[in-house]
Amino acid sequence: MSGLGIMVLTLLLLVFMEASHQDAGEKQATQRDAINVRRRRSLARRTVTEECEEDCEDEEKHCCNTNNGPSCARLCFG
């Protein structure tokens, strides 16, 4: 194979490797964004009203926001 053919194949290989590397970076950024969204949603679910906090404080528990509305519990998950 001529020197020019080897150079062309090398160039194609480098282009392919660079494109593959960029795809991996985009995938990693997408995964990182998805994790950040999950964290924000988790914190939003913990938003509770002062009334709930006062009611649970009497029972020495924390006010947790669930699908069915606020409730008192020793630990909040989610």
Swiss-Prot record:
Kindly report the protein's main subcellular placement as a broad class. secreted
**Where in the cell is the protein located?**
Secreted
> What keywords tag this UniProt record?
Amidation, Cleavage on pair of basic residues, Disulfide bond, Knottin, Neurotoxin, Secreted, Signal, Toxin
- Signal peptide positions are 1-19
Here the disulfide bonds are 52-64, 56-72, 63-76
Q: Does the keyword Disulfide bond apply?
A: yes
Q: Which residues form the propeptide?
A: 20-44
How is expression of this protein distributed across tissues? Expressed by the venom duct.
Q: Which GO terms describe its molecular function?
A: ion channel inhibitor activity; toxin activity
Indicate where the modification Phenylalanine amide is found in the sequence: 77
Q: Which is a Gene Ontology cellular component entry for this protein?
A: extracellular region
UniProt key word Ribonucleoprotein: no
Query: Known InterPro entries for this protein?
Result: Conotoxin
Q: What is known of its domains?
A: The presence of a 'disulfide through disulfide knot' structurally defines this protein as a knottin.
Q: Which family does it belong to?
A: Belongs to the conotoxin O3 superfamily.
From the Swiss-Prot or TrEMBL record, give the protein name. Conotoxin CaFr179
Starting at the broadest rank, the lineage of the source organism is: Eukaryota, Metazoa, Spiralia, Lophotrochozoa, Mollusca
